[in-house]
Amino acid sequence: IFSLLLSMVACGSSNDDVVKVPDTEQPDPDTPQTGTDYDDLGWEHAEDVIKNMGLGWNLGNTLDACDYNQIHDGGDWMFWETCWGQSVTTPELMHMLKQAGYGTIRVPVTWGIHMDANGVVYSSWMNRVKQVVEYVLDAGMYCILNVHHDTGADEKAWLVASMKEYEAQKARYEGLWKQIAETFKEYDHHLLFESYNEMLDERRSWCFSTFNGEYDEEMAADAYAAINSYAQSFVNVVRSTGGNNVGRNLIVNTYGACNGTGTWNKHLIDPLVMMELPEDVVENHLLFEVHSYPNIDNLNAARSEVADMILNLKKHVVAKGAPVIIGEWGNSSENPSLENKIAFITDFVEQVKAADMGMCYWMGITNGIARQVPAFSEPECAKAMLQAFHGTDFQPELPTMDAVNFSYAVTYQQQWSEVHLCSENISLDEYKGVKVELDGAPENGSLSIKVYGETEGVEQYTSMTSDCLEVTFDSSKLGNKVRRVTLQCSLDTEYCITIKRAVLIRKDGTEEIQCPTSFWGCDVLLQK
């Protein structure tokens, strides 16, 4: 788990305060599209939410961040919000995204570690979630609020797709959604609820139920029945709380949020076929959700995979009476080129939009300390998706890290502690080195740039003796890629430095600004 020393943000009011009803406007375009269908409450139907919500983005690795083995106060919202290396969320970040052309923010939230033994959500956590939701709504965007890593592959995840686990956790799950629904019951139609994220069976199988191990028809049927039971419980509880929740648009996910794509196993389609539309007291206010992460090393194959996904969703899910949102999408390639990423993003957005489906990107366009500035850490990717959605003539406002004059104050607290300079897999076909600039020469022998090679245990060290050090990657030692680059401190006492600039150097000599963050044993503070 990573930590950042970040500026404090007020946590909001107590549970006794009146819930604020944000006075928000429609996202771009500022008025609903012609033909928007409203019910007696004056609320959009689900199909029209898809039309009006625009392009979406996930506030990922933030309120969803968790570690079931971590012993820490569940009410300490700032610790958990930043424990996966992200900055404290600010209103400025949401306004930047709105100004750029985004219309929806999905806010993933993990709840279980923030509940007491009786299933009551800590007031400090609920208030922080409420505050972040209001940041989104006040910026004029739609917001999707969910239950996130309470599901998933972790053995300690408490929401599991089996009827036995459903019966055991039903009261706690419904109690959680009752608390969420009561907190937000007077918020308007720009707020949507999502039932659960990627719920898996007792084997923690991705792709389809019982994929892990020999296929078990009985266990798989039980898992799909449980998914439908959780979905129905969610709808029933939210509607029962009254207020605006009577007509709120609600999202239910397939098993594992699987999208049914692929031909390598006949059971891949099962999560779509077995998904049911919950019964509801109102019509046309439910949506289905799936996720999509194609490998993009072969762009033609990725394009076909997206097209097949859309066909399957229309045939097996939309036909059941509700539209679809791709609640998470991105790519699963280990080290894709920027060219491939842009081509894939453009094609994905164009195909999904043409199919009248919604989409929320996961999540890299603004990442780490870039969110605190705020700025776009991947402006090329952001521009590609925005132009694919709004049209090639659309020119988004995309502030970048290199346009801001700031530095990073680092406090090393343990011997051998490290600051991330750049942590993604780095192809040595595209990059030749890294450069770091400090505000002064370090203490002799105290700092080294540490480069992690392709193979575990293979590392390249270069001692830093002046205020600037450029390191060329040694491919003969490191292999075809670099897994991580850090600035390591050898001192066994607290030691403070200021990083003025860190860049990756491309083969053509151009530089790519990096955002240093804590790896372990140190704090990093952004200084503007």
Residue ranges and their predicted role:
Residues 1-5:
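Sec-dependent N-terminal signal peptides
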Residues 6-37:
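Bacterial Sec-dependent N-terminal signal peptides
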Residues 25-53, 401-408:
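N-terminal low-complexity, Pro/Thr/Ser-rich intrinsically disordered segments
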Residues 38-44, 50-260:
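Active-site mouth of glycoside hydrolases
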Residues 62-71, 260-261, 296-299, 369, ...:
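Short, solvent-exposed loop/turn elements at domain surfaces
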Residues 77-78, 82, 86, 103, ...:
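Extracellular glycoside hydrolase catalytic/binding regions
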Residues 377-401:
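C-terminal functional modules
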Residues 402-483, 489-515, 520-527:
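Extracellular ligand-binding interfaces
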